[in-house]
């Protein structure tokens, strides 16, 4: 496995590029989703830039350059502005912008010839805070990450002239208000100045006196955009609870007192609810608030470019006595992709096919290794996993696709099943999901595809730009190569074996945790029968339907 260096985020510039000429880290497990170098006749690229950093009320020119190295009959251009920016002078070639909780979106279908096309439009800053402009270009008729480009411009809009800065910091942030995605005000959070003392000062507990327990409840939710159910120019909007997130209840017993950890727990699986209780030391607790982190116990987490977990802090409750509710707390809008990736891993966790309380059966209870995802706004460090640090690296818009997140996590799962060992994989960079690569690439990538299919109960692959491809196949499927060197054939054959022969994938995963396979042939012919998994006529017929014959 080659070594590589994790690229840490740098302050964002005014210009961002994606697609053509993108630089990729050398990794051992290149993904079907990675923006790997593609043949010259299949490249699309896009850049986006602002001519100035606008403060609130000021305008700036957004310039988008689309580059093609081949003819593309229908290229889809999608532009998304955050709620803090508004289109004020639209280029007439673009569709009328639509507005939703995520900001404004406009698009256009283009016919491209080799060269560069430029589109300009005027935008205005209408609110302060972190902001991200995104541009996507893709081949509508041939969805594939190698025929697509993504660009991102990040800035933090200030109120006073000249106060807007490059880049955006959202690792630690306040919750987004229930009524909308942004707010000029900031809720009280740890370290903030203490409010005025309550009109009735709290009474300190007399020696030996105990006050009744206080419970604080609420629900954590996340608003995000999803490629599942969306399209290249309109991803689906989702508003869902966040499951199994670490939550800590903090407080100050008195107005001038120090911050204390009162209680900790997890949000509820499926509903995002929490109820944390503590025994106060005074009759009234001056302040109480909740902090949520993108970590589930110690089993999985999402971190930024510096390996820090994202955290969202609720508004503070004042003068607390008796049971209270924080109501619905929304993850900070700038962190929505981190929380989406986090909650996507929860789907995989509850159907991971393990007989232990770890990700895989070969790990002992209480001695589990986690799955870690690294993502940050504007990231170009993706899309891949490495077994050197057992970390998934997602690029900027990757978390919008749950399939992408789980595909990469599927590599981590295989690495755990193999206890850190990895096959010697050849002819896998680049590789195409529906084309022949090698039998080792077809096996490792096909397994990761199958993990995504199994988790989402489908055979549709989605990408972060909203495009998708249905990979359901048989011997008559056109546009897909035959055999076990094609990952789509391997992935769909695996899920059919699990569902139609094995009664789920737990037995297969247990077998994989005891034996190592470099190819699908080895998995099917050698190890399945050795562990009592069917490789007879019914199983072979499934493979035959997916053009795999042994």
Curated annotation (Swiss-Prot):
Its cofactor is Zn(2+). Residues 1-34 form the signal peptide. One of its GO terms (molecular function) is metallopeptidase activity. The active site is at residue 408. The keyword Protein biosynthesis does not apply. One of its GO terms (biological process) is proteolysis. Keywords: Hydrolase, Metal-binding, Metalloprotease, Protease, Secreted, Signal, Zinc, Zymogen. Binds 1 zinc ion. It is found in: Secreted. GO terms for cellular component: extracellular region. Residues 180-208 have a biased composition (Low complexity). Residues 160-209 are annotated as: Disordered. Residues 35-205 form a propeptide. Its EC number is 3.4.24.31. It catalyses: Preferential cleavage of bonds with hydrophobic residues in P1'. Zn(2+) binds at residues 407, 411, 445. Its main location: secreted. It is an enzyme of class 3 (hydrolase). It comes from the Bacteria. Belongs to the peptidase M5 family. This is Mycolysin. It comes from Streptomyces cacaoi.
């Amino acid at each position: 496995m080659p070594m590589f260096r994790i690229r840490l985020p740098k302050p964002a510039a005014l210009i961002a590029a994606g697609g053509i000429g993108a630089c990729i880290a050398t990794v051992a497990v290149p993904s079907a989703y990675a923006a790997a170098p593609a043949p010259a006749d299949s490249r699309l690229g896009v850049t986006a830039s602002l001519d100035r950093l606008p403060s609130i009320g000021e305008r700036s020119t957004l310039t988008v350059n689309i580059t093609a190295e081949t003819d593309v009959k229908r290229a889809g251009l999608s532009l998304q502005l955050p709620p803090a920016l508004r289109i004020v002078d639209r280029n007439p070639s673009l569709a009328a912008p639509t507005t939703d909780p995520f900001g404004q979106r406009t698009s256009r279908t283009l016919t491209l010839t080799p060269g560069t096309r430029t589109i300009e439009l005027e935008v205005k800053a209408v609110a302060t805070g972190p902001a991200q402009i995104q541009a996507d270009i893709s081949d509508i008729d041939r969805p594939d990450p190698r025929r697509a480009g993504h660009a991102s411009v990040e800035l933090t809009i200030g109120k006073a002239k000249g106060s807007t800065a490059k880049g955006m910091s959202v690792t630690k942030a306040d919750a987004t208000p229930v009524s909308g995605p942004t707010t000029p005000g900031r809720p009280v959070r740890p370290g903030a100045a203490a409010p005025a003392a309550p009109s009735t000062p709290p009474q300190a507990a007399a020696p030996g006196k105990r006050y009744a327990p206080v419970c604080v409840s609420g629900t954590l939710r996340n608003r995000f955009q999803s490629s599942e159910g969306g399209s290249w120019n309109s991803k689906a909007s989702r508003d869902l609870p966040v499951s199994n997130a670490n939550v800590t209840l903090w407080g100050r017993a008195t107005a001038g007192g120090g911050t204390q950890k009162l209680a900790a727990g997890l949000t509820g699986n499926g509903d995002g609810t929490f109820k944390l209780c503590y025994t106060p030391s005074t009759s009234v607790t001056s302040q109480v608030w909740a902090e949520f982190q993108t970590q589930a116990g110690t089993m999985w987490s999402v971190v930024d470019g510096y390996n820090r977990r994202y955290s969202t802090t609720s508004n503070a409750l004042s003068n607390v006595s008796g049971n209270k509710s924080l109501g619905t707390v929304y993850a900070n809008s700038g962190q929505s992709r981190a929380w989406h990736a986090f909650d996507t891993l929860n789907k995989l966790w509850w159907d991971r096919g393990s007989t232990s309380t770890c990700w895989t059966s070969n790990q002992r209870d209480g001695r589990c290794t986690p799955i870690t995802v690294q993502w940050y706004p504007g990231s170009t460090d993706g899309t891949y996993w490495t077994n050197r640090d057992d970390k998934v690296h997602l690029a900027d818009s990757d978390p919008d696709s749950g399939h992408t997140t789980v595909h990469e996590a599927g590599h981590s799962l295989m690495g755990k099943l193999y206890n850190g060992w990895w096959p010697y994989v050849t002819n896998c960079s680049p590789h195409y999901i529906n084309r022949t690569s090698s039998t080792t690439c077809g096996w490792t990538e096909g397994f990761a595809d199958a993990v995504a299919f199994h988790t989402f109960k489908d055979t549709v692959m989605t990408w972060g730009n909203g495009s998708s491809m249905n990979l359901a196949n048989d011997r008559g499927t056109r546009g897909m190569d035959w055999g076990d060197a094609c990952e789509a054939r391997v992935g769909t054959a695996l899920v059919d074996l699990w569902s139609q022969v094995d009664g789920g994938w737990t037995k297969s995963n247990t077998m994989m945790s005891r034996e190592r396979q470099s190819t699908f042939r080895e998995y099917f012919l050698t190890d399945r029968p050795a562990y009592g998994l069917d490789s007879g006529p019914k199983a072979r017929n499934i493979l035959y339907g997916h053009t795999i014959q042994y």
